[in-house]
Amino acid sequence: MDIKKYENFHLEEIINLYQSVGWTNYLERTNILEEAYANSLCVLGAYDSDRLVGIIRAVGDGRTIVFVQDIIVLPEYQRKGIGTKLLKAVMEKYKDVYQMELLTDNTEKTKAFYRSVGFTASDDMGCVAFIRM
């Protein structure tokens, strides 16, 4: 499994990843999705030979904050350490950044995953997160 910079946006493979995990909100306006990828701070892909099987996308200023916007692994490749490798690669790249944040589903599975790589839920720190959609 190779983790490397995702440089050439291919709409079909990105759509495949998002659909495989049931993320459809972005797929209604693919032109915006393509712009979002182009304007991201960092996008890394996980490759099985030449096949894109996972992706992580980070946004932010790269100095004081990095926000992990997307992390997706094809279902048949999940539970094999790929998500961990993707996340750790971004964490290493931005190890000197003051804070790294993400927003995820409120399930024990996702909370356990992010805690296992060193993240803390904001409410455990006496904080609250707000979102406007």
Predicted regions and their residues:
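Short amphipathic alpha-helix that is part of the acyltransferase structural core
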Residues: 1-27, 125
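Residue-level recognition of the GNAT/N-acetyltransferase active site
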Residues: 6, 74, 105
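Active-site rim helix/loop that mediates acceptor-substrate recognition in acyltransferases
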Residues: 22-43
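Conserved beta-hairpin
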Residues: 34, 41-56
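A conserved beta-turn-beta hairpin within the catalytic core of GNAT-like acetyltransferases
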Residues: 60-68, 124
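Conserved acetyl-CoA pyrophosphate-binding loop and the N-cap/start of the following alpha-helix
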Residues: 77, 81-89
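Conserved active-site alpha-helix within GNAT-family acetyltransferase domains
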Residues: 84, 106-132
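Conserved GNAT acetyl-CoA-binding A-motif
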Residues: 93-105
